[in-house]
């Protein structure tokens, strides 16, 4: 699963997920899966979608993951009273804004790419759309 090798601080504030995304263009591959909604993707969700795509294209072509879970999410254990400090880091998430390209693919026909991204999108909690590279 994806997570940073080391961070400056172990725990971070909750923060907000506002604004528009960076990385809105398909830059590595020919086809992409772009976020339409806003939300968070956990490392497990990113990996599950990647596996679904890899199986769908039968390991041909190339897949790029354009998001990285760099925000630690903490949780307190069950049945623990409030207070006594912030909980332990349980998992890592990537904050997603509308327009962000999540995955890219190349070396496969468009129909196969569409099918693979459809399977991947089913694993994700946010609304997505299929995009192709625009040549100027």
UniProtKB/Swiss-Prot annotation:
GO biological process, alphabetically ordered: translation
Instruction: Report if keyword Translocase is assigned.
Output: no
PROSITE patterns registered for this protein in UniProt? RIBOSOMAL_L16_1, RIBOSOMAL_L16_2
**Keyword set for this entry?**
Ribonucleoprotein, Ribosomal protein, RNA-binding, rRNA-binding, tRNA-binding
Name a single GO cellular component: cytosolic large ribosomal subunit
Q: Name one GO molecular function term.
A: structural constituent of ribosome
Kindly give the InterPro entries that the UniProt entry links to this protein.
Ribosomal_uL16, Ribosomal_uL16_bact-type, Ribosomal_uL16_CS, Ribosomal_uL16_dom, Ribosomal_uL16_sf
What is an example of a Pfam family matching this protein?
Answer: Ribosomal_L16
Oligomeric state and interaction partners are given as: Part of the 50S ribosomal subunit.
> What is known about what this protein does?
Binds 23S rRNA and is also seen to make contacts with the A and possibly P site tRNAs.
The family classification in the record reads:
Belongs to the universal ribosomal protein uL16 family.
Question: Which PANTHER family is this protein grouped with?
Answer: 50S/60S RIBOSOMAL PROTEIN L16 (PTHR12220), LARGE RIBOSOMAL SUBUNIT PROTEIN UL16M (PTHR12220:SF13)
Entry-linked HAMAP family: Ribosomal_uL16 (MF_01342)
The name of this protein is: Large ribosomal subunit protein uL16
This protein's species is Erwinia tasmaniensis (strain DSM 17950 / CFBP 7177 / CIP 109463 / NCPPB 4357 / Et1/99)
């Amino acid at each position: 699963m994806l997570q940073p090798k080391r961070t400056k601080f172990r725990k971070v504030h909750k923060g907000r997920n506002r604004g528009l995304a960076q990385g809105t263009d398909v830059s590595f591959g020919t086809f992409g899966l772009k976020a339409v909604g806003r939300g968070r993707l956990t490392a497990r969700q990113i990996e599950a979608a990647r596996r679904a795509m890899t199986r769908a294209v039968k390991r041909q072509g190339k897949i790029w993951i354009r998001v990285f879970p760099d925000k630690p999410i903490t949780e307190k254990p069950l049945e623990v009273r409030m207070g006594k400090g912030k909980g332990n880091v349980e998992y890592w998430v990537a904050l997603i804004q509308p327009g962000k390209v999540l995955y890219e693919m190349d070396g496969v026909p468009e129909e196969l790419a569409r099918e693979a991204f459809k399977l991947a999108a089913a694993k994700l909690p946010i609304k997505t759309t299929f995009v192709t590279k625009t040549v100027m």
